[in-house]
């Protein structure tokens, strides 16, 4: 009799629509995994987002930092997590560059995740040491081409977005510069400020204060249009580099097989945060911009990720750069 009752109960559950099963979601705290150390740009975005989403969802969204291996450690962790809607990943461009940078990976960005949404874009800036003779982009291009063997191009480390930006710059200029990798943006900036290196491409979250203080030369921003944080800064395309665009974008992912209804509810909380004025203002203060509505969807993120993999793969492979 007990067996029959159990079977009847099981069949009853199977007849309940999937959406109904997710109506009570979430019933406990949710983990948002960040692939980098606390205090960095992605971590700041994640924590600001998590605080807003916690209010919307009625459960705490806990940020967990799992730094290492250029973000692939966190990616592998989330890919193998239970697909129940209680573990998510927020990652930047590293999701699109890892397939080319790493010959061995524990996950496939295009097949091992469900896509939730993009969130915010952080523009990059091209800056130079204050005493560099070139004062605008046209002058810098001429100076670089005439002094290619003397120019030191700093970056925040192998595979960092600043490294990728530097590779794209060299391709656009048609030169090979001496690249100097550092263990993060802070030491790279310090070297630039101290005159040990000549130019650096890095995020507005790190460079804006120095630009406004006048301690570096600003040559332009790496976006298609000018940005609100630095409205007088020309784009690099305006400066002569055709169709030049590099942004630090952030996408949110879930383990493959996570219920669609849970992804929709979590994604809805993301979209609510992206429209919250306090969140928008905080991001603007960091130089970050909210992505358009078309990117705030699973398909928008999937399409963007696929395009970025196609964009960066050839750049990285042509440079012969590997992180493992």
Predicted feature residues:
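Hinge/capping helix and adjacent helix->loop/strand transition within the periplasmic-binding protein
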Residues: 80-86, 100-187, 236, 249-282
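Short beta-strand->loop
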Residues: 108-118, 176-180, 198-199, 208-246, ...
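N-terminal (or domain-start) structured segment
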Residues: 22-111, 150-152, 158, 174-203, ...
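An extracytoplasmic/periplasmic, membrane-proximal ligand-sensing/linker region
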Residues: 27-29, 212, 238, 260-324
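Bacterial N-terminal signal peptides that target proteins for export
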Residues: 1-8
